[in-house]
C-alpha cells in the first residue's frame, strides 16, 4: 500500500492533527502491510513519487493508497504563505487514479467554515477568503481523483455539501497499549476533573471553570496548547483560583494527569461545529478508563450517552453542579 502525507509526518502529539497520521501509519504496519511512505518536503515528495512511478512501471502492484490531510490547505501544507504551484500532491492523486490505484483520504476538519481562520492563523478578511479558496480547491481535487473520503463523523458530511464522492465515518480510535486508569486517591475530599484540549471560540468551557470555582470540593486541571491559553486567558481569568491548574503538556507527559484524575471533561458550550466533531481526547479518556463529563447535543455528548461511559448534561451550571456534587458524595458513580 501507499501512505501519503502532504508534509513532514508530525512527531509531536500536542493535538489530534499531529497524533493521528503517525498512529494510522503504525496501524497499517502492525496489520502487516508493506507500506510505501510518501511524505517530507516538496522535493522529498517529488523524489519519492518518481521512485514510486518507476516501481509501478517495473510491474510492482499496490492494493490502495491512503492519505491523511493536513489541517492546512494542501498547497500551503508545508507552512509556506505562498502556494506550491508544483501541485505534486494533486498530481499524485491523479496518477493513482490513472493507474487504477484506489485512493482514500482522512479529511480532518472544516473549522475554516466556521470563522476560525482569523483566530487560528491570524488572517484578515481578504487573506481568509484567499485561504478558504484553497480549501475549496482541495475538495474539487478530491472529488475528481479520490475514491472515498473518511470523515471524523457522518454529521460532518451534512455541513460539507461540496463533498460529492463517497464518504464514511472514521473517528479516532483507542490505543489499547496505554495504561488503564486506577483510582488511588487516599484523600477523597476533592473531586479531580481533567480537561485536555484546545480553547477557542468553538471550544468554550466557561461554565465548567465557573462551577469549579464555586465549590471547594472540586479541582480542575486544564491541559491546553500554550498559544491557545495565551489567546483565551482573558476570557477565563475571573474564574481562576488555587484549585484550577493550567498546564501545557503532551504525549507521555499526559499519563500522570490521566492517572490522577477522577473525571475527564469535554464540557463545551454547544454549537454546530461541536455537533459533528469527535474530540480526540474523548477516546484518550476512554483509553485511560476515565468516566467522561460531556455536553448534551454535541457529538461527544451523544457518544458518551449512547455508550454509557459517563454523563451527558445540558450546558447549565445548575445541572453540572448537581451532578458533580452527587458524584463527590457517592464515588461509586465513578466505578
Residues of each region from the PLM?
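Conserved acidic donor-binding segment of nucleotide-sugar-dependent glycosyltransferases
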Residues: 306-307, 311-318, 325-332
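Donor nucleotide-sugar binding/catalytic pocket of nucleotide-sugar-dependent glycosyltransferases
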Residues: 131, 136-140, 144-182
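N-terminal subdomain of nucleotide-sugar transferases
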Residues: 1-44, 48-50, 60, 100, ...
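Membrane-proximal helix-turn-helix segments that form the acceptor-binding/catalytic region
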Residues: 87-102, 113, 122-148
Amino acid at each position: 500500500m501507499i501512505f501519503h502525507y502532504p508534509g513532514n509526518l508530525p512527531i509531536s502529539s500536542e493535538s489530534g492533527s499531529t497524533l493521528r497520521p503517525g498512529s494510522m501509519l503504525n496501524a497499517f504496519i502492525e496489520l502487516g502491510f508493506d507500506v510505501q511512505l510518501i511524505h517530507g518536503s516538496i522535493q522529498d515528495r517529488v523524489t519519492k513519487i518518481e521512485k514510486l512511478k518507476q516501481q509501478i512501471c517495473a510491474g510492482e502492484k499496490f492494493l490502495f493508497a491512503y492519505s491523511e490531510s493536513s489541517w492546512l490547505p494542501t498547497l500551503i501544507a508545508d507552512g509556506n504563505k505562498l502556494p506550491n504551484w508544483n501541485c505534486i500532491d494533486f498530481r499524485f492523486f491523479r496518477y493513482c487514479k490513472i493507474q487504477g490505484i484506489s485512493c482514500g483520504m482522512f479529511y480532518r476538519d472544516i473549522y475554516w467554515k466556521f470563522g476560525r481562520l482569523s483566530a487560528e492563523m491570524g488572517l484578515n478578511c481578504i487573506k481568509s477568503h484567499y485561504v478558504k479558496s484553497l480549501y475549496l480547491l482541495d475538495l474539487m481535487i478530491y472529488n475528481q481523483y479520490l475514491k472515498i473520503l473518511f470523515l471524523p463523523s457522518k454529521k460532518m458530511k451534512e455541513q460539507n455539501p461540496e463533498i460529492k464522492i463517497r464518504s464514511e465515518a472514521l473517528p479516532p480510535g483507542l490505543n489499547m497499549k496505554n495504561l488503564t486508569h486506577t483510582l488511588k486517591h487516599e484523600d477523597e475530599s476533592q473531586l479531580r476533573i481533567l480537561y485536555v484540549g484546545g480553547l477557542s471560540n468553538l471550544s468554550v468551557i466557561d461554565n465548567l471553570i465557573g462551577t469549579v470555582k464555586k465549590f471547594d470540593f472540586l479541582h480542575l486541571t486544564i491541559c491546553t496548547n500554550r498559544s491557545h491559553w495565551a489567546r483565551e486567558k482573558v476570557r477565563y481569568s475571573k474564574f481562576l483560583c488555587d484549585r484550577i491548574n493550567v498546564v501545557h503538556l503532551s504525549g507521555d507527559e499526559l499519563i500522570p494527569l490521566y492517572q490522577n484524575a477522577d473525571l475527564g471533561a469535554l464540557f463545551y458550550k454547544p454549537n454546530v461545529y461541536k455537533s459533528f466533531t469527535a474530540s480526540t481526547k474523548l477516546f484518550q479518556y476512554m483509553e485511560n478508563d476515565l468516566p467522561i463529563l460531556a455536553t448534551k447535543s454535541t457529538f461527544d455528548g451523544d457518544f458518551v450517552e449512547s455508550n454509557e461511559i459517563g454523563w451527558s448534561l445540558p450546558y447549565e451550571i445548575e445541572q453540572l453542579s448537581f451532578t458533580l456534587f452527587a458524584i463527590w458524595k457517592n464515588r461509586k458513580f465513578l466505578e
